[in-house]
UniProtKB/Swiss-Prot annotation:
Pfam families: Glycos_trans_3N, Glycos_transf_3. This is Anthranilate phosphoribosyltransferase. InterPro entries: Anthranilate_Pribosyl_Tfrase, Glycosyl_Trfase_fam3, Glycosyl_Trfase_fam3_N_dom, Glycosyl_Trfase_fam3_N_dom_sf, Nuc_phospho_transferase. Catalyzes the transfer of the phosphoribosyl group of 5-phosphorylribose-1-pyrophosphate (PRPP) to anthranilate to yield N-(5'-phosphoribosyl)-anthranilate (PRA). 5-phospho-alpha-D-ribose 1-diphosphate binds at residues 81, 84-85, 89, 91-94, 109-117, 121. Pathway: Amino-acid biosynthesis; L-tryptophan biosynthesis; L-tryptophan from chorismate: step 2/5. GO terms for cellular component: cytosol.
């Protein structure tokens, strides 16, 4: 009965509070809504625009339903985007996670198969010989030992399967597209979060603040769900519940802008070749710089605030080829 009341509230264009949304999404991941109810709920949320309270409630429900991951007591982060920006670039956040781990940061990367591009994080890692289906225990071991693990979303969020038919039928973005980066089963309190639209920056930032992150950043880079090498990046930085908005350019990292065309990716096999060259220090300069900018911002969440110094440190470590060794180590788990 309560589910029907909540659906009625949505149809009246009234927002749900966090607790109500948590109840509704718990019902969704348990398969308690039929496809027509679920479809109607997702469309009602989309047309009105999801509030931070609603996004937070959905995240809480999905995290409670997720398979557990042994959360470490040391600082670690995630770098992840919503996808869906339609730009079909190389996998910048996946490369940045590997490079940042090579620098000595701890990164629990949450990811999935491709949404709208040709190559999602798991597609790429599989092409590189990484087993994305390892157990939570094994993944934690990798995080402890080499500073990097990959958590494959469908393995932890089994309840998502109930929404797949409706999402495929709707063929449009729904709240599920924006939940992915926020439901890492390791529950990192430091995240570099990329969003596909600048309209999402503020609600995302407010959601992150509600969820109690220690230090996270939400970015949208001139059409990309990453920090942009080709233009201006809009930023919301969340620290201790406070949100600060500002913009960044490539010059803030010590680089000159490069055309977006230089970052175009392709199929998993093509992106794997591009990433291998990059991690070996043999990649295109634009690829290295794009990864350095995103890794530099990730470093700032660990107490390294100087973005130019960070970017240079990352360029130096890429030149050594050490990130490729980190990738090789990851394939052993």
């Amino acid at each position: 009965m309560q589910t029907e009341q909540l659906l009625h509230q949505l149809f009246e264009k009234k927002a749900l509070n966090q607790q109500q949304t948590e109840f509704l999404f718990t019902a969704i991941v348990r398969g308690q809504l039929d496809n027509s109810q679920l479809s109607a709920a997702l469309i009602a949320l989309k047309l009105r625009g999801e509030t931070p309270e609603e996004i937070s409630g959905a995240v809480t429900a999905l995290q409670a339903d997720a398979e557990s991951f042994p959360i470490p007591d040391y600082p670690f982060a995630d770098i992840v985007g919503t996808g869906g920006d339609g730009a079909n670039t190389i996998n910048i956040s996946t490369a940045s996670a590997i490079v940042a781990a090579s620098y000595g940061l701890k990164v629990a990367k949450h990811g999935n198969r491709s949404v709208s591009s040709q190559t999602g994080a798991s597609d790429l890692l599989t092409a590189l010989g990484v087993n994305v289906h390892i157990s939570a225990h094994k993944a934690r071991q990798a995080l402890d030992e080499i500073g990097l693990c990959f958590l494959f979303a469908p393995q932890y969020h089994l309840g998502f399967q109930h929404a797949i038919p409706v999402r495929q039928a709707l063929k449009t973005r729904t709240i599920f597209n924006i939940l992915g980066p926020l439901i890492n089963p390791a529950k990192p309190k430091r995240q570099l979060l990329g969003v596909y639209s600048s309209d999402l920056i503020q609600p995302y930032a407010e959601t992150v603040a509600r969820l109690g992150h220690e230090h996270s950043v939400v970015v949208h880079g001139s059409g990309l769900d990453e920090i942009a090498l080709h233009g201006v990046t809009e930023v919301a930085e969340i620290k201790a519940g406070q949100i600060e908005r500002y913009t960044l350019t490539p010059q803030d990292f010590g680089f000159q802008p490069q055309p977006l065309e230089t970052l175009r990716g392709g199929k998993p096999s093509e992106n794997a070749q591009i990433l291998t060259a990059l991690l070996q220090g043999k990649g295109k300069l634009a690829h290295q710089q794009a990864v350095a900018m995103n890794s530099a911002m990730l470093m700032s969440l660990f107490g390294y605030p100087n973005l130019k110094q960070n970017a240079q440190a990352i360029m130096d470590i890429i030149a050594t080829g050490k990130p490729f060794e980190t990738l090789q180590q990851l394939t052993q788990y």
